[in-house]
Amino acid sequence: MVSVETVGSIFIKALKLIINLVIIFLYRWGDGGEFLGIGGTWNLNEEKSADAEIVASGVMVGFLIYTGCHTIAFAFGTTKHKGELCDTIMNVVGCIMWIAVGGVALHYWKGYMSDEGFLYVNSERQVGIAMGSLCVIEGALYLLDTVLACIHYSKGDTDYTQ
């Protein structure tokens, strides 16, 4: 029989994939069809930090691939991979990285002012704040998935505990 933790984990992984895709679309086309980006620094020209953009795009694409592969593995119905320590470690890393990327985005876009007449409220800023908020929510989902992975691991269904 399928456990509640397994169903919850599959649901959370599907939700993580959907939110991850939304974040990638906002990141790439969030500025009226142009590149929005994470931001990451204020300077004289209001240019975005290349370092923050590289890390953010790596987190977004990397965890999309990892979560997609892991969700497909869940669909095969075997119980061996559910209690692997690797899943727990990747969820902890995902939680930290998503919250860090979301924090950088929120920090940048909260203080962002448009070039057009010093407008404090504009669509680019609002989309940036929404993207940062979704990144923090994604980090919270990875934390919740970490808890479920720890429950799977503690149940002792793997060869490691025998």
UniProtKB/Swiss-Prot annotation:
<feature type="transmembrane region" description="Helical">
    <location>
        <begin position="129"/>
        <end position="149"/>
    </location>
</feature>
<dbReference type="GO" id="GO:0007496">
    <property type="term" value="P:anterior midgut development"/>
</dbReference>
<feature type="topological domain" description="Cytoplasmic">
    <location>
        <begin position="75"/>
        <end position="88"/>
    </location>
</feature>
<dbReference type="GO" id="GO:0019991">
    <property type="term" value="P:septate junction assembly"/>
</dbReference>
<feature type="topological domain" description="Cytoplasmic">
    <location>
        <begin position="2"/>
        <end position="6"/>
    </location>
</feature>
<dbReference type="GO" id="GO:0016327">
    <property type="term" value="C:apicolateral plasma membrane"/>
</dbReference>
<feature type="topological domain" description="Extracellular">
    <location>
        <begin position="110"/>
        <end position="128"/>
    </location>
</feature>
<keyword id="KW-1133">Transmembrane helix</keyword>
<dbReference type="InterPro" id="IPR038976">
    <property type="entry name" value="Ssk"/>
</dbReference>
<feature type="transmembrane region" description="Helical">
    <location>
        <begin position="54"/>
        <end position="74"/>
    </location>
</feature>
<keyword id="KW-0812">Transmembrane</keyword>
<dbReference type="GO" id="GO:0005920">
    <property type="term" value="C:smooth septate junction"/>
</dbReference>
<comment type="subunit">
    <text>Forms a complex with Tsp2A and mesh. Interacts with mesh; the interaction may be necessary for the localization of both proteins to the cell apicolateral region.</text>
</comment>
<keyword id="KW-0472">Membrane</keyword>
<feature type="topological domain" description="Extracellular">
    <location>
        <begin position="28"/>
        <end position="53"/>
    </location>
</feature>
<keyword id="KW-0965">Cell junction</keyword>
<protein>
    <recommendedName>
        <fullName>Protein snakeskin</fullName>
    </recommendedName>
</protein>
<comment type="function">
    <text>Required for assembly of smooth septate junctions (sSJs), together with mesh and Tsp2A. May be important for barrier function of the midgut epithelium.</text>
</comment>
<feature type="transmembrane region" description="Helical">
    <location>
        <begin position="89"/>
        <end position="109"/>
    </location>
</feature>
<feature type="transmembrane region" description="Helical">
    <location>
        <begin position="7"/>
        <end position="27"/>
    </location>
</feature>
<feature type="topological domain" description="Cytoplasmic">
    <location>
        <begin position="150"/>
        <end position="162"/>
    </location>
</feature>
<keyword id="KW-1003">Cell membrane</keyword>
<dbReference type="GO" id="GO:0005886">
    <property type="term" value="C:plasma membrane"/>
</dbReference>
